[in-house]
């Protein structure tokens, strides 16, 4: 499925893939103001947990007084609302005086940021969009606002790396759509009036929206509220022509099991659905008396190194609970009401129909489970079935994979990447030849195999290709053309091979062999077209009076002046290419989104080419258009309003500068609307970034992104402080370079400080930032960066904001981020990189924020707890805020608003005046205006590390 997540909307063009809205995150679109649940008390489960420390010994007395005042206000707070009426969100009373407000900030209660920030975050969300298979209709999927904290507070089971809502039998914290509407795409490029999908229950929560192959039906799940909880999901279908929706099953006792695979279209009238087994009964009960001690043993002396995974199974009771919630009964359900159970209940994780709709690839997990790795490494069976449920054969039964090495490019032993060819019903897989250990030197390293769905007796798998790097997938076209990808992270090498799957006498050849870091040499990716079977294959293009084999290459067009996306017509045999489309370079940033003339058999004619493009500028949000050949006629099909008109005239510039070692650096500088440095003077500045590793100085210095891209502002984005008249230095590059055999992190601190110094000097030189009023911030690895900069470069920054970070690398001993040496192999590196070890050096105010339920590997909540205690133990001015029920990324409106309030308070108090005992802290929150304590204090707010897409949306690994 193609998704385009710009500032405030998203497209999907793959009708066979499930559409389910993402959980709100810093990159999510702006969302609408929801009703907030009332809180009867200000308990620690419902209110932000704040810890603070001040160098002044009087703080303890003042904190005690503040706590007493909070207790006296608790009942009043629980009855008030942010607008002065209605249900409460647990916020403090708006009648508090300025002095009381800052004292109360030391305690508990959710707060609101100033109106200029709040209004941007509360802007209405634009629907997500999905094209029909024939590209003649657009489905508008309507979304709700930021969810209330009550949604996150629902009980959840944490099992094998999965968080489960046991009442619904779904993943917990699932967001949803609230309504569906269909527009016909008219010949002139305009949209018909909306046809609303009717019949959906009031308040229905919609997920997993998918088109049938012929585009005549939609399938989706619906949950409704029952006694304060969401019901178990039920599968519904809608007739696209009439717009009428109805339940798929006649029985009201058949529910969807949405823990793993939900449902797939087998043909245009039949779905294969994962259902809750009707006979499963009540969930297992935890024994009151344990049957014995918990034991882990390694008497076989097996080397098992794993990262700090979270939410793992703890005992046999957890294993039983995992089986209970994850096990499904597969059911074939036709639109005419016919129902047939297939197979036996099992933990099915994937259902993949073949291109001819005769076979299924069925994947399932089974025991023995593990207590040290998540379910993705559990024993796994992959089988071939017919679509009516008949077992054909077993492809593999992979054992438990606890011993995958931590080195980059290490993989599971045995068959992997098992799937169908996109152009015919043949199974495809890769097998490692190095035992999965990237440190082993072997050739070949991977072998790619292919075999028909039902091989003849004695028929051996066919070797499709042998690779010396790690296999990375295949783009299929037909028996004469496919592209095989391989790469190796340590060297950043990536290669693309051309093969002829149906011709053994045609030798594979290398098409591209380059560095993945070298964005200037990126030739682009082949464009795919949709087949009648619903799969995607390489689009072959036919030119008039030309027998060449042409494909379309869609590239980002990175240049020293910024990205200029392009579309090339590429001769796969000669390497010759012709640029048939290119983005505007002066004012607009345009991209090719998808091929729209793909519902045709055979090669596509150049003169019939139709593509979907996007267009935006620094101040104009993204709109979508159709472009038709041969005359390149443009038909705009969307007209989304500006999501935050109050910042429509913000100033944006991509700036370049140099580090003292000669490395070229870039950043995006944002300035408030109407700001003139010659008249207004320098501004307070927020420096928000995220480091990245590189193998070469040249690659590190390349420009990424475009100066003409629209400034999308997420709900926790640093750009929100443009509304508070800050200069924002967004994503200043902080390359940590390890050339040759050198590991990047061997000189982490040195390169980190040098990059920050260069960025600060540049904004000061330009006269837009006051040197004494620059704050630094980031989340996850960006929070780690923030703490290190305050420890090793305190002269650069007035204060810091660190959200959901990890600060003590000895607590992640088997690697972190892109570091794959262990603590015992690189002890000095782990210690020197850990700001925890330099807590005694941090003298500038630091705000720590963390979700109480952070499940990101490496960033356990205790990282912030322990770092705060280390800082407090050395008299640092610090504040820690722990957000109840929040994970690595924050989603509840109460949490997000409080994070913004905490961040704004910190900036106004310690950056704008740049004094630790400032007596002003302007805050126009409904709950009261902030005022400084009479003693130096530090406190905290929160934001996740894993969602800052402005800086690291394309990072290769999960942030640790």
Swiss-Prot record:
Enzyme class: hydrolase
GO MF entries: serine-type endopeptidase activity
The protein's Enzyme Commission number: 3.4.21.-
Organism superkingdom: Eukaryota
GO cellular component: chloroplast; chloroplast stroma; cytosol
Location relative to the cell: Plastid, Chloroplast stroma
Enzyme active site: 780 (charge relay system), 854 (charge relay system), 888 (charge relay system)
Record's compositionally biased regions (Polar residues): 89-98
Protein keywords: Chloroplast, Hydrolase, Plastid, Protease, Serine protease, Transit peptide
Transit peptide as recorded in UniProt: 1-62
Primary residence: plastid
Family: Belongs to the peptidase S9D family.
PANTHER family in alphabetical order: GLUTAMYL ENDOPEPTIDASE, CHLOROPLASTIC-RELATED (PTHR42776:SF28), SERINE PEPTIDASE S9 FAMILY MEMBER (PTHR42776)
General function of this protein: Serine-type protease active in vitro against the LHCII N-terminal. Cleaves its substrate on the carboxy-side of Glu residues.
Protein name, UniProt field: Probable glutamyl endopeptidase, chloroplastic
């Amino acid at each position: 499925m193609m998704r385009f997540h710009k500032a405030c909307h998203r497209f999907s063009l793959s009708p066979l893939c499930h559409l389910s809205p993402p959980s709100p995150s810093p990159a999510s679109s702006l969302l609408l103001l929801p009703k907030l649940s009332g809180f009867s008390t200000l308990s620690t489960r419902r209110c932000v947990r704040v810890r603070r420390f001040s160098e002044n010994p009087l703080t303890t007395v003042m904190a005690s007084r503040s706590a007493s005042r909070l207790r006296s206000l608790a009942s009043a707070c629980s009855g008030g609302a942010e607008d002065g009426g209605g249900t409460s969100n647990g916020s403090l009373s708006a009648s508090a005086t300025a002095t009381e407000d800052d004292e109360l900030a030391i305690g508990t209660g959710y707060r609101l940021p100033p109106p200029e920030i709040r209004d941007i975050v509360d802007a209405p969300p634009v629907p997500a969009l999905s094209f029909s298979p024939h590209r003649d209709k657009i489905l508008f999927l309507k979304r709700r606002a930021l969810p209330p904290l009550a949604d996150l507070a629902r009980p959840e089971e944490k099992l094998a790396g999965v968080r489960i809502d046991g009442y619904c039998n779904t993943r917990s914290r699932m967001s949803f759509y609230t309504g569906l509407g269909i527009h016909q795409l008219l010949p002139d490029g305009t949209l018909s009036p909306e046809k609303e999908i009717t019949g959906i229950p009031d308040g229905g929560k919609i997920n997993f929206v998918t088109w049938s192959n012929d585009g005549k039906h939609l399938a989706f799940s619906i949950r409704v509220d029952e006694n304060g909880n969401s019901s178990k999901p039920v599968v519904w279908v809608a007739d696209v022509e009439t717009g009428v929706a109805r339940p798929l099953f006649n029985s009201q006792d058949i529910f969807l099991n949405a823990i793993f695979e939900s449902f797939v279209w087998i043909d245009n009238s039949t779905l294969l659905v994962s259902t809750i087994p009707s006979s499963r009964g009540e969930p297992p009960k935890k024994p009151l008396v344990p049957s014995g001690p918990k034991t882990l043993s390694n008497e076989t002396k097996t080397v098992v190194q794993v990262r700090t995974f979270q939410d793992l199974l703890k005992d046999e009771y957890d294993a039983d609970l995992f089986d209970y919630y994850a096990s499904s009964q597969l059911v074939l359900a036709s639109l005419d009401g016919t129902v047939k159970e297939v197979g036996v209940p099992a933990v099915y994780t994937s259902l993949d129909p073949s291109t001819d709709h005769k076979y299924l690839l069925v994947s399932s997990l089974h025991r023995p489970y593990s207590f040290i790795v998540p379910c993705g490494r559990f024993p796994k069976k992959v089988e071939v079935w017919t679509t009516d449920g008949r077992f054909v054969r077993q492809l593999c039964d992979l054992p438990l994979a606890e011993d995958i090495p931590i080195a980059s490019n290490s993989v599971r032993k045995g068959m992997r990447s098992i799937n169908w060819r996109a152009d015919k019903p043949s199974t495809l897989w890769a097998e490692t030849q190095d035992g999965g250990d990237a440190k082993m030197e072997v050739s070949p390293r991977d072998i790619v195999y292919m075999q028909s769905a039902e091989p003849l007796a004695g028929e051996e798998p066919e070797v499709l290709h042998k690779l010396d790097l790690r296999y990375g997938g295949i783009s299929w076209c037909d028996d004469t053309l496919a592209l095989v990808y391989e790469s190796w992270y340590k060297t950043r090498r990536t290669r693309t091979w051309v093969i002829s799957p149906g011709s053994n006498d045609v030798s594979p050849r290398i098409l591209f062999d380059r560095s993945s870091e070298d964005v200037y040499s990126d030739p682009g990716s082949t464009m795919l077209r949709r087949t009648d079977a619903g799969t995607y294959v390489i689009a072959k293009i036919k030119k008039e009076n030309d027998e060449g084999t042409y494909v379309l290459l869609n590239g980002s067009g990175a240049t020293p002046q910024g990205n200029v996306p392009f579309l090339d017509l590429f001769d796969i045999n000669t390497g010759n290419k012709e640029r048939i489309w290119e983005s505007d370079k002066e004012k607009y940033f345009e991209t090719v989104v998808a091929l729209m003339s793909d519902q045709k058999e055979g090669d596509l004619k150049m003169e019939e080419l139709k593509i979907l493009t996007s267009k935006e500028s620094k101040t104009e949000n993204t709109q979508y258009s159709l472009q038709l050949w041969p005359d390149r006629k443009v038909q705009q099909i969307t007209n989304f309003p500006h999501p935050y008109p109050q910042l429509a005239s913000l100033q944006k510039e991509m700036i370049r500068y140099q580090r003292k070692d000669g490395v070229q650096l870039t950043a995006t500088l944002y300035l408030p609307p109407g700001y003139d440095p010659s008249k207004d003077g320098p501004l307070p500045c927020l420096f928000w970034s995220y480091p990245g590793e590189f193998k070469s100085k040249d690659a590190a210095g390349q420009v990424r992104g475009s100066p003409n891209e629209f400034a999308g502002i997420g709900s926790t984005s640093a750009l929100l402080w443009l509304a508070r008249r800050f200069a924002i230095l967004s994503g200043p590059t902080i390359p940590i370079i390890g050339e040759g055999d050198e590991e990047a992190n061997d000189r982490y601190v040195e390169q980190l400080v040098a990059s920050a110094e260069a960025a600060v000097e540049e904004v000061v030189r330009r006269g837009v930032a006051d040197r004494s009023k620059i704050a630094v911030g980031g989340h996850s690895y960006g929070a780690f960066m923030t703490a290190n900069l305050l420890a090793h470069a305190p002269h650069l920054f007035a204060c810091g904001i660190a959200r959901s970070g990890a600060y003590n690398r000895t607590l992640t001993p088997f690697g972190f981020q892109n570091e794959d040496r262990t603590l015992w192999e690189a002890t000095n590196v782990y210690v020197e990189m850990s700001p925890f070890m330099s807590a005694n050096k941090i003298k500038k105010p630091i705000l720590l924020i963390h979700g109480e339920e952070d499940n990101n590997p490496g960033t356990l909540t205790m990282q912030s707890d322990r770092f705060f205690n280390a800082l407090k133990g050395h008299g640092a001015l610090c504040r820690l805020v722990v957000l109840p029920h929040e994970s690595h990324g924050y989603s509840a409106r109460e949490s997000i608003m409080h994070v913004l309030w905490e961040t704004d308070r910190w900036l106004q108090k310690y950056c704008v005046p740049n004094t630790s005992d400032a007596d002003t802290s302007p805050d126009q929150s409904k709950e009261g205006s902030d005022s400084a304590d009479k003693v130096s204090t530090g406190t905290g707010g929160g934001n996740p590390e894993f969602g800052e897409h402005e800086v690291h949306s394309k990072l290769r690994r999960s942030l640790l």
